[in-house]
């Protein structure tokens, strides 16, 4: 479809409502205004007018707003018709507009895509629109607004600018090798490179927290039957989400709860007790449990404190630990402290976190909540923070890898050409975040996930 067509779509959710909005963008927006309104409204002023059908009869009446390009959201001429929110009325008005020559229904996200293509916002800001709509907490919404206002993009532009200056310096050293000063070995380039690498690492840290706010942390509760996994799920969820009995193997399928801890979204997953299955249904449940464990951001290894005094995971259940992915973070949760009399608290044991609590009474649950926040580097202070997507994290990781490789070339061989190439690749990876170097396929995937009227 052509990006020069004039597009129209409903900008409010489908269904009944007090107000329904149709948005038109493109060179024929003024023609739509003359046909439906009988006049072109004064730019950026609200005008209360009847909306006319082709025969002159009134379909509805409401507010019309006209924004001539480039001073509009999309950078094109934009007309918004704000009428009553009945689906029949909106459908009649939409059909009236589509009957005009050169008009078509907008693709999902096409208004935002045109804003991007017309340099009204960059790709990270465009994605922030969708993230703001989908925000599941106040902090996620505030961070999405920061991204929309350019907080994330500004950090990326600073890094790109620093890399540009560094590339100029490196390439000058390559082009003028006969100068008395060896620019590659005098330490100045390495100092600048180290500074950029440190700044990039700080942005990566903030982006990881932004991704956490957007997507949530996946925490899987795993362990033997009757260790208290479902009781812990209920305690974290604050409700009876799972059935709890003294019968081993009560939980046979995966149970999911979505909760927030101080604005941080968590996906808590309760799984079937791990043991040799007694029947086919239990076997399937245990297989699903392992699938969830392998995809987790963190595992809460639930231990019945009345059955063992051990605190090291390998000593508690070596076969379980042997099957876990080596890089998967684990927190050992010694449950039933109300029975064993153990002191509630969090400690570190040989690189693993250990927490003593009682899922039945709720004692120690607040300690676990704080631990989950801290383990993911989450802080309650997100003022100035931004949201990030997985593609952003991947681009930042790629850029960091190129800078590390460039640093190795510099300190080991003073290989200016190789360093310059690594700097260029790092710069390109960063520019993909804001859309300065992005394939049409990537843009299509991003904007297709938006609402129709966005």
UniProtKB/Swiss-Prot annotation:
Subcellular location(s) of the protein: Cytoplasm
EC primary class: hydrolase
Highest rank taxon of the organism: Bacteria
Single GO term (MF): GTP binding
Binding site for K(+): 226, 245, 247, 250
Cofactor (UniProt): K(+)
Keywords, in A-Z order: Cytoplasm, GTP-binding, Hydrolase, Magnesium, Metal-binding, Nucleotide-binding, Potassium, tRNA processing
Protein name, per record: tRNA modification GTPase MnmE
The organism of origin for this protein: Yersinia pseudotuberculosis serotype O:3 (strain YPIII)
Lineage: Bacteria, Pseudomonadati, Pseudomonadota, Gammaproteobacteria, Enterobacterales
Gene that specifies this protein: mnmE
